[in-house]
Each structure stands twice: as structure tokens, then as C-alpha cells.
């Protein structure tokens, strides 16, 4: 098992370009962020977006990045040091209990794309709390239908392993736990935002083989353990073997493609 420092480096090298950058690009293509004031980036990872925003501000504001992983924060701080970026700082902290006073930031950006659905409301409520009145809140997330191709073959693998009836209810929960776009917008309004709007993109992740998919850092570090929670521990190796077999059969010598429904939900406090 990877230690926390190795996981942080894997996050920076693999998960940021394969996953995070897609959501950050969606923000950059959909809206213009202010070039002055205070901006907070919650769950900032290894700091790329916060650093990019700070560089655009040319000394007219401050960007604060916060992340629960001290190892990722250390990588972000090292990047800022190399860039001699004095207008960005990074802190370790928990998104559901942000270490800031209310009404501190003109813009609050938060990454919920790797959170479970039941964790998003606490994150969003905290983002709204620390935003200034009339401040903008921007939430990155995935919506229902993400990884739909995987769940289809997962069902086949569970059936082949003789477990489909035992875990069907849990699998159905996994398939449906992500918010729909309308549910996400309604959540933003319940948390205190107005003028809520959303921007979406349909992304594809491509893997040459089942092994490439199941051993990709994005999958192993961020999703696979949750997917396998519904399977008894003693049966997981069998289910993984069935998954490899089903994926390689279904892809028919073509890449295994999975869809990510990326969304940015934004509103004004």
C-alpha cells in the first residue's frame, strides 16, 4: 500500500492532469474570475489552480489554497516557491470545517469531484459561510451517469461471480448516489446561493486494457476501494478477475472508455 507522501506525488503526477485539470479548464472556459481581492480554493490538491489564479492577479489580490493532505500542501508550497509567487499561500485543513471567519473571501472555489455525494452539502455550506455577501461560490463536481460504462461491466462481473443478488441494492446505491444536475443546483440554493447556474462537459477517460484501467492511479487511489466495499473481502480478488475478463471481452480490442460528467455549479451569496 502506498504511503501518504507517495499518494501525494501520484496525485500531482497522474490525477491532476487526468482529472482535476478537466474541471479547472471548465471553470476557465465558462467564467471570468476577478483579478483582485481574496480568493479561496478549497480541496486545492497540489495547488495548480490557485497558483494560476494568483499569477493572473499580478499582485492585486491574494489566493489561499486549503487541502486536507499535508503532503499535497507541501507540494503546492514548493511550486509557489519555485514560481516566486508571493500572492498565494497554502494551508492544511478540512473542507467541512474551514479555519476562516465568515465573509472573508470574494470568491470561493471548491472541488467536490472526488467526494462522496453525502459529503458535498457540508463542503458547500462552509464555502458559502466564508464567502463575502455578494461573493461568488464555484463548486466542481461530477453528476449522475459518471462511470456508467464501468458500472455496466461491474454488474456483469458480479453476476459472473455469483454475487449479483447479494449486492444489487448496494450496487444500485453506487450507481445512483451522484446528484443529477438539477439536484446539484437545488442543493446550491438550499445552502444560500442565488442566481445559480451550471456549466457542464462530457469527458472521456481512455484505457487500452482492463489492467490499465484497474491499475490507473486515478482509479486505485480515488475510486476502486469504494466500488469494492459492496463485496465481501474474501470475494474481492475473484470479482476483480471477473472485471478484467468482462472489460477485455467487451472492449473487443478497442480502448475501454468511461464517461465523466463534469459540472461546475456557481451562484452568488
Which positions does each model-derived feature cover?
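Class I SAM-dependent methyltransferase Rossmann-like catalytic core
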Residues: 5-18
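Conserved alpha-helix/loop element of class I SAM-dependent methyltransferases that forms part
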Residues: 18-37, 52
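Short glycine-dipeptide loop
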Residues: 36, 59-60, 131-136
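Class I SAM-dependent methyltransferase SAM/SAH-binding core
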Residues: 38-42, 46-97, 122
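A short acidic, Gly/Pro-enriched loop at the edge of an enzyme's catalytic core
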Residues: 96-108
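A short SAM/SAH-binding and catalytic strip from SAM-dependent methyltransferases
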Residues: 106-120, 141
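Conserved catalytic/acceptor-binding region of the Class I
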Residues: 121, 134-208
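C-terminal helical/coil "lid" or tail adjacent to the Rossmann-like core of SAM-dependent
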Residues: 195-253
Amino acid at each position: 500500500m502506498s504511503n501518504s507522501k507517495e499518494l501525494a506525488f501520484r496525485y500531482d503526477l497522474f490525477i491532476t492532469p487526468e482529472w482535476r485539470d478537466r474541471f479547472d479548464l471548465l471553470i476557465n472556459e465558462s467564467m471570468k474570475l476577478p483579478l483582485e481581492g481574496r480568493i479561496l480554493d478549497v480541496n486545492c490538491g497540489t495547488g495548480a489552480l490557485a497558483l494560476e489564479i494568483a499569477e493572473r492577479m499580478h499582485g492585486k489580490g491574494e489566493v489561499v489554497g486549503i487541502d486536507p493532505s499535508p503532503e499535497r500542501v507541501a507540494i503546492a508550497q514548493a511550486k509557489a516557491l519555485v514560481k516566486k509567487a508571493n500572492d498565494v499561500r497554502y494551508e492544511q485543513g478540512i473542507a467541512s470545517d474551514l479555519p476562516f471567519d465568515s465573509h472573508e473571501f470574494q470568491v470561493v472555489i471548491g472541488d467536490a469531484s472526488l467526494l462522496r455525494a453525502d459529503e458535498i452539502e457540508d463542503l458547500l455550506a462552509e464555502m458559502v459561510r466564508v464567502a463575502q455577501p455578494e461573493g461568488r461560490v464555484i463548486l466542481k463536481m461530477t453528476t449522475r451517469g459518471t462511470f456508467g460504462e464501468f458500472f455496466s461491466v461491474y454488474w456483469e462481473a458480479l453476476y459472473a461471480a455469483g454475487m449479483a443478488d447479494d449486492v444489487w441494492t448496494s450496487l444500485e446505491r453506487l450507481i445512483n448516489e451522484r446528484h443529477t444536475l438539477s439536484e446539484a443546483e437545488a442543493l446550491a440554493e438550499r445552502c444560500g446561493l442565488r442566481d445559480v447556474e451550471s456549466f457542464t462537459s462530457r469527458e472521456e477517460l481512455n484505457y487500452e486494457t482492463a489492467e490499465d484501467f484497474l491499475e490507473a492511479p486515478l482509479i486505485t487511489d480515488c475510486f476502486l476501494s469504494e466500488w469494492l466495499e459492496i463485496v465481501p473481502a474474501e470475494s474481492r480478488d475473484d470479482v476483480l478477475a471477473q472485471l478484467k475478463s468482462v472489460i477485455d471481452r467487451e472492449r473487443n480490442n478497442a480502448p475501454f472508455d468511461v464517461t465523466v460528467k463534469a459540472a461546475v455549479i456557481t451562484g452568488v451569496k
